[in-house]
Amino acid sequence: MAHKKGASSSRNGRDSAAHRLGVKRFGGQVVKAGEILVRQRGTKFHPGVNVGRGGDDTLFAKAAGAVEFGIKRGRKTINIVEPATQDA
């Protein structure tokens, strides 16, 4: 057996925990105010109607309603609409 660890083994052993990014509430789901819709780095999704953006670009619901994904001016947006209008 080796008496020294070897060059590479002593430099290994680091890994970071996952950040749990991604969409948390999907289209058509009913949410309450304050619920997190998307955790993201940068603005992959932009806030729309009744949606706010946190300091780390997290999108959250400002009002209760149904989640709606859309595109406006070439940007992916997320809106919160009244649940009654979701008859589709």
From Swiss-Prot:
Cleaved signal peptide residues: none
Region (Disordered) location: 1-21
GO biological process, one term: translation
Alphabetically ordered keywords of this record: Ribonucleoprotein, Ribosomal protein
Taxonomic superkingdom: Bacteria
Cystine residue pairs: none
InterPro entries: Ribosomal_bL27, Ribosomal_bL27_CS
GO cellular component: cytosolic large ribosomal subunit
Membrane spanning stretches: none
Family matches, as Pfam families: Ribosomal_L27
GO molecular function, one term: structural constituent of ribosome
HAMAP family: Ribosomal_bL27 (MF_00539)
NCBIfam families membership: L27
Family classification: Belongs to the bacterial ribosomal protein bL27 family.
Stated name of the protein: Large ribosomal subunit protein bL27
Organism of provenance: Mycobacterium ulcerans (strain Agy99)
Highest classification ranks of the organism: Bacteria, Bacillati, Actinomycetota, Actinomycetes, Mycobacteriales
